[in-house]
Amino acid sequence: MKKAIIIEDETIISFGYRLQLESLGYDVLGTARSSEEAETLLNEVQPDIIIMDVYLKGDKTGLQLAQEIHARQQIPVLFLTASTKPDIVTAIRQLKGCHYLTKPINSDSLEDVLVRFAQN
């Protein structure tokens, strides 16, 4: 079973992602609401994929956190964001091992991206 963590500052949205991931056969190892919680969680678990928002509570954005994660380990990151700002989209595309979907998230789109990540 594939393992995931969710890094999202909105609890209800995080819960929805958990349900979607579990319905696709993922084991959700934990959730974090801030960059600091995410760092703690990543020291405790080893996910196969990270589902993350671009904008987080705490000192770091999702983009900064992804860069730090990839400096230590190559865990794919799927950004789920409402932002369509060109600079954000460009920054995500420049990060190796990252992809994004725009909120609201369609279950089929989520599944397609997760399948592509699993194949790589």
Protein language model regions, located:
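Acidic catalytic/metal-coordinating carboxylates
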Residues: 34, 60-64
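Short amphipathic alpha-helix used as the core "switch/output" element in two-component signaling
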Residues: 63-72
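Hydrophobic/aromatic residues positioned on beta-strands within the core alpha/beta folds
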Residues: 80-81
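Receiver (REC) domain switch/active-site region of two-component response regulators
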Residues: 106, 115
